[in-house]
């Protein structure tokens, strides 16, 4: 796996699924391939994206700045600086300085990542802030190691909370989660449908599912009534894909 592929993988792991994730993936690919060289326009686009947390925007801004060649005097962006200040906690800043000194001695991506993984997310963000604000310099490889360590920590905590939700025994949360998943699957079906004859069928199935979820939410239903809703939808989606000659397993 190349270095940039690894960076893209880690960064995308902290972006919530949806159309915006696909857009960000495309931007990252373009930046890494040297196709997008307008850093200012890129940062303006990033700043106005909805849904993303300030820290995720800060990390993406840091990656774009590291990768896109720019004039020396180009202004640093406030939204990135604010996201990478470790919540203004002086402890984070102290640890960030210690980490920075260690990173200065590293020359490889994996070496930097291993060193960084033993620090808290706040300290890692502050350390990125130091480098972003030109208070310290490290090689691009080392900076990417720092980015990936930060993303790994964030993804770990997201995974823990996701797993807690998936394994909860609270029937109301499980019911709502099934309905949300059914809704997003229906949305994906509509986006994939295109304009063929079979597409009308897929659209119809998706539309019925969304109406059903809406009705369940409006009138209130027994928490077990949503069981199988997403699975039925996925079955329909896979049957539709087979007829279209497409095989996509990723929805599971």
From Swiss-Prot:
* Membrane-related topology note: Peripheral membrane protein
Q: Where in the cell is it found?
A: Virion membrane; Host nucleus
State the span of motif (Nuclear localization signal): 101-105
Region RNP-binding, annotated ranges: 165-252
The GO terms describing molecular function are: RNA binding; structural constituent of virion
Q: What are the recorded Gene Ontology BP terms? A: viral budding from plasma membrane
Identify one Pfam family in the record. Answer: Flu_M1_C
Q: Reply yes or no: does the keyword RNA-binding apply.
A: yes
According to the UniProt record, where is the region Membrane-binding?
Answer: 1-164
Q: Which UniProt keywords apply?
A: Host nucleus, Membrane, RNA-binding, Viral matrix protein, Virion
Query: Predominant location of this chain?
Result: virion
| Lineage top rank: taxon | Viruses
Q: Which GO terms describe its cellular component?
A: host cell nucleus; membrane; virion membrane
Output the InterPro entries linked to this UniProt entry: Flu_matrix_M1, Flu_matrix_M1_C, Flu_matrix_M1_N, Flu_matrix_M1_N_sub1, Flu_matrix_M1_N_sub2, INFV_M1
Note whether Oxidoreductase occurs among the keywords. Answer: no
Similarity comment text for this entry: Belongs to the influenza viruses Matrix protein M1 family.
Q: How does it assemble?
A: Homodimer and homomultimer. Interacts with NEP. Binds ribonucleocapsid by both interacting with genomic RNA and NP protein. May interact with HA and NA. Cannot bind NP without genomic RNA.
Q: What is this protein called?
A: Matrix protein 1
Give the encoding gene's name: M
